[in-house]
């Protein structure tokens, strides 16, 4: 999932997008990207953000879809990769709904017939992703074995952020058990 490193953003999207608001700190030619509370899709940085997050979600969907029927027979390492893909997909969609609200939502590789679908309400996306993250956390270690790897804390932290963003303090988060 090199996509997060390949994007031309040196700073995480959540911080950059805050800078592009009327009250933000960004003073370059893109300073009006978020003026008025909207993101201009004609701006190259916004297009790169949208495309990059969907590339991450699509790659994760390919891994998840290809492995979902074989999870029970997988090695612990393979199950961890499967869970990491689910967390990365959730993070990509979290970034998208944080910036755009309702967005097209896919949980499997997209066919040509599904390419142009409507937007899914962000509440439905959040509900799906919270359940998915709780399931994924079962396959993740508490401490990552390598720098940059996903662990349980990442999954549970993302669940908490989505719960707050979605307006619910009562999300089902296995970390509270």
Name each region found by the language model.
Residues 1-15:
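Membrane-proximal, proline-rich intrinsically disordered regions
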Residues 97-98, 104, 144, 165-174:
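Short coil/turn linking the two alpha-helices of tandem helical-hairpin repeats
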Residues 107-109, 157, 170-177:
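Acidic, serine/threonine/proline-rich low-complexity intrinsically disordered regions
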Residues 148-158, 162:
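Amphipathic alpha-helical protein-interaction segments enriched in hydrophobic
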Residues 2-4, 24-100, 114-127, 131-147:
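Conserved, well-structured interaction surfaces
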């Amino acid at each position: 999932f090199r996509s997060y490193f390949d994007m031309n953003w040196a700073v995480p999207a959540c911080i950059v997008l805050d800078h592009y608001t009327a009250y933000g700190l960004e003073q370059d030619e893109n300073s009006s990207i978020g003026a008025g509370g909207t993101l201009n899709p004609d701006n190259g940085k916004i297009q790169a953000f949208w495309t990059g997050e969907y590339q991450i979600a699509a790659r994760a969907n390919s891994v998840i879809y290809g492995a979902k029927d074989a999870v029970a027979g997988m090695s612990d390492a393979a199950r961890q990769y499967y869970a990491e893909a689910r967390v990365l997909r959730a993070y990509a969609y979290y970034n998208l709904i944080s910036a755009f609200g309702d967005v097209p939502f896919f949980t499997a590789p997209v066919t040509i017939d599904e390419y142009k679908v409507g937007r899914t309400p962000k509440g439905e996306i959040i509900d799906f992703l919270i359940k998915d993250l709780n399931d994924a956390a079962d396959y993740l270690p508490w401490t990552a074995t390598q720098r940059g790897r996903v662990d349980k804390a990442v999954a549970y932290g993302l669940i908490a952020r989505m719960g707050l963003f979605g307006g619910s303090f009562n999300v089902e988060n296995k970390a509270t058990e």
